[in-house]
Amino acid sequence: FTDVRLNLWLLDVASGKMTVVDNDAHNNLNTSGGAIESPRWSPDSRWLTYAKRLPGQMNAAFVYEVSTGRATQITDGMSDAVEPVFSRDGKYLFFAASTNVATNVGWLDMARLDKPVTRSLYAVVLNKDAASPFAPESDEEAVKAASDDASGEKKDDKKDDKKTEKKEDAGAKKETKIDFAGISQRIVALPVPDRAYAGLQTADGKLFYGEFIPNKPGFTLNTFEFKDRKSSVYAEGVSNYTLS
């Protein structure tokens, strides 16, 4: 949670201990009325990610390790990075970033009103050994293996084994491993055009994100499917949403 002094706090419910995670000291003119933006947990609850404003008035994405109490900046501050969120499998960190937000930093005049801010969507490959979500795909067709099932019993056994494996996978805790060395070289852009994006949330194999379109009520909720590497409209006229 945050307070009026722009601190982000972490409360251990079991012990009642409260820890200051970070402070958004350079965001004292935050028009949203809050401090550090959109803190989100990793799937294993070992990391917390958030965006905060830097001295140059650009936001950057950070991750905080609960066990060490150390916060690490992920983006370089040359673009305005906001709304970082972990993928459900803990392999990636997604965020939206803008390189034309500087014309909107000023707040005292109305000259910035006709300069809409656009953002691109990015994914950070957190583990150095993990594959990029947009690695080149092979165009070779898979060869169907010859079946050595002599009876229906073997097929049933295989089905039961697969069901057991799925249950075990579903119950297993997905560890989020972050290699900070060279992490800036593992940031890749999603193949979507620059738009006024906001409201990033993740589901299994998907990224949901809102798009503000001029002269339309609410925002358009889109979903990006990583398996197909395609985006599609999920709903229109959305005022708010959340994923369980």
Language-model regions, residue ranges each:
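A flexible loop/linker signature enriched in serine peptidases of the S9 family
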Residues: F1-S15, V20-A35, R46-F62, T68, ...
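C-terminal closing repeat unit and adjoining cap/tail of repeat-based domains
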Residues: K91-A96, E225-D228
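A short helix->beta-strand "capping" segment at the edge of beta-propeller domains
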Residues: E175-P193
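Short, solvent-exposed loop/turn elements at domain surfaces
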Residues: A131-F134, A196-L200
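Conserved blade-ending motifs and adjacent loop-strand segments that build the rim/top face
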Residues: T72-P84, V188-A198, D228-L243
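Blade-terminus and WD-like Trp-Asp/Gly-His loop motifs, strongest in beta-propeller folds
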Residues: P39-W47, E83-Y92, G199-G205, N240-S244
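Cationic-aromatic interfacial patches
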Residues: G199-S244
